[in-house]
């Protein structure tokens, strides 16, 4: 299973801890010199900034760039987005996109997989694949 995490801020670091047994690759533009990305991934988790600007209450250009620059079967967007953005991105890129928002934002660490539920939005088949990703981890 090849997994990529794009963005290594609070959200990306937390996700890395949660998926550590899958040995995900990490890419962050701040650390270009450590770029070891593969040509293709099963899953790419997008954890980039979507800042508020006067022109756009949720600037998703970095999300679009992350999707364009990485090749994956399914892109899981952890970044904050406005409703309808994932559908728009899917229409523009033709990629399989699942939205799985964070519960804690840019605050202290919180293990999302310890919750009794996970929010997934997108095509049902793609969402099931993301859900199954967790069951493929060896349980300690």
Residue spans of the language-model regions?
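Surface-exposed, flexible loop/turn segments at secondary-structure boundaries
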Residues: 11, 32, 52, 83, ...
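Short, well-ordered alpha-helix to beta-strand connector turns
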Residues: 23, 40-42, 72-73, 93-94, ...
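Rossmann-fold dinucleotide-binding core
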Residues: 48, 81-140
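Short, well-ordered alpha-helices that flank and scaffold nucleotide-derived cofactor binding pockets
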Residues: 17-21, 68, 87, 91
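Small/polar loops that bind or transfer phosphate-bearing groups
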Residues: 7, 77-78
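Rossmann-like NAD(P)-binding element
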Residues: 35-74
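NAD(P)+-binding Rossmann beta1-loop-alpha1 motif at the extreme N-terminus of oxidoreductases
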Residues: 1-40
